Structure formats: C-alpha cells, structure tokens
C-alpha cells in the first residue's frame, strides 16, 4: 500500500523545494510530484487539455477539478515508490473532497498526512516577487493566488484535523531545518 503525503502552503512557502529535497535524499523510497509541475508539463504539450490548463493558470485561477484529480491519480499510480509526496494539493474544498472520495474507493494508496508549510503573507510575497519564475509572478497575480490559497484554507485544515492527519510546520526557518523536521516526520510512519 502506497503512503501519500500532501504538502500544502501559500505561494512562496517553499513546499515544492522542501518536497524535492526530501525525495532526493530518499530517492529509493520517496517520489515527489508538484501539482504545479504536473499541470505546467501538460500545459507545455499544447494539447487541448494543456491549453485549457494554461487559460486558467495564466490568470492565477484554479484548473478544473477533474483535470487536476486525473493528473494526480495518474502520477501516484505510475510511481514505483512506496511513499508519494504531492505538493500544492488540495487547493480547494472541492479538490479535497474529490481526492478523499477517490482514495476511499480504492486500497492501493493511503493518505498518511497533510503537512502545511506555514509562512506569513509578507514572507510569501517577498519570496514570490523576488524569484520571478514565470509570467504569473507579478503583484496582482500574487494577491489573486494568495486569495485562492487562503479562502478555503480553514475548511481544509479542519477536514484533515478531524481525520487526525493534519500537521503544521513552521516555514519561516532555514530550508535545512524545515526539510529535516518534515523528513523525520514522514519517515516516522515506516513502511
């Protein structure tokens, strides 16, 4: 049975980098997928689905639910690793419910934890506007992305707290400290 860890956090919280480093440090047993990377890869293919994804992401809006869930489940199932880290998911209550429904209907993957990398809005803004990764990283789009992240956050936190799988990690520290704490936590579940 594959162990799934969802890593959430504001834009600029470092969730993708944290997950990448943990997967790299434990490459024999941990695979990492960034929802953003999966969607960007699909978008770059310029397929019908890719163009649809691009239309939403270029405006900082959420990609339609069925496209995101399909993309994520396909990544989990195709992996040969026992521990899967996915960052940037869920971003909405609907995404959370859709994944929960899919996970409940099968017995190949079990959700072990949802880890939130917590940072202040100021820290997130400094990091995002300072890195200019792509066309979406300007101030107006940042505020839109922040709103999209914050609006459903309380409900997402409560849902996973009630399932006893929620964990918050302080993202205002050095990357080494954050990665160390998160990696120890993930590995504490064993195989």
UniProtKB/Swiss-Prot annotation:
Cellular compartments per GO CC: cytoplasm
Compartment(s): Cytoplasm
Domain notes: Consists of three domains, a large central CORE domain and two small peripheral domains, NMPbind and LID, which undergo movements during catalysis. The LID domain closes over the site of phosphoryl transfer upon ATP binding. Assembling and dissambling the active center during each catalytic cycle provides an effective means to prevent ATP hydrolysis.
Subunit text: Monomer.
PANTHER family: NUCLEOTIDE KINASE
Taxonomic source organism: Helicobacter pylori (strain Shi470)
GO MF terms held by the record: adenylate kinase activity; ATP binding
Name of the molecule in the record: Adenylate kinase
Pathway entry: Purine metabolism; AMP biosynthesis via salvage pathway; AMP from ADP: step 1/1
Residue numbers binding ATP: 12-17, 131, 173
Database matches in InterPro entries: Adenylat/UMP-CMP_kin (IPR000850), Adenylat_kinase_CS (IPR033690), P-loop_NTPase (IPR027417)
Region (NMP): 34-63
């Amino acid at each position: 049975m594959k162990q799934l860890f969802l890593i959430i956090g504001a834009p600029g919280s470092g969730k993708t980098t944290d997950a990448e480093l943990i997967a790299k440090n434990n490459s024999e047993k941990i695979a990492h997928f960034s929802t953003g990377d999966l969607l960007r890869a699909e978008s770059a293919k310029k397929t019908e689905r890719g163009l649809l994804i691009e239309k939403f992401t270029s405006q900082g809006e959420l990609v339609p639910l069925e496209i995101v869930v399909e993309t994520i489940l396909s990544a989990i199932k195709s992996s040969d690793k026992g521990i899967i880290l996915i960052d940037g998911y869920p971003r909405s209550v609907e995404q959370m419910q859709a994944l929960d429904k899919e996970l409940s209907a099968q017995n190949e993957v079990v959700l072990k934890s949802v880890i939130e990398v917590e940072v202040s809005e100021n820290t997130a803004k400094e990091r995002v506007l300072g890195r200019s990764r792509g066309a979406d990283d300007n101030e107006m789009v940042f505020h839109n992305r922040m709103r999209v992240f914050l609006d459903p956050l309380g409900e997402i936190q409560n849902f996973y707290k009630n399932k006893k799988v929620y964990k918050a990690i302080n993202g205002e520290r050095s990357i080494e400290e954050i990665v160390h704490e998160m990696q120890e936590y993930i590995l504490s579940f064993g195989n």
